[in-house]
């Protein structure tokens, strides 16, 4: 496997974890708006991506 394939799998893996966290939080916080949670995880994802590429 070349590094591009590994990078794609890693991005899919990270996206799966983030979506899983959001789904768990939505289940735990039924009735509340998950928008701020999604924004928080997007911010974390952006922070981790930018630090990986530096």
Curated annotation (Swiss-Prot):
Record's subcellular location: Host membrane
One GO term describing the cellular component: membrane
Membrane topology term: Single-pass membrane protein
Keywords: Host membrane, Membrane, Transmembrane, Transmembrane helix
Residue stretches spanning the membrane: 6-26
Domain of life per record: Viruses
Protein's name according to its UniProt entry: Uncharacterized protein ORF54
Species assigned in the record: Acidianus bottle-shaped virus (isolate Italy/Pozzuoli) (ABV)
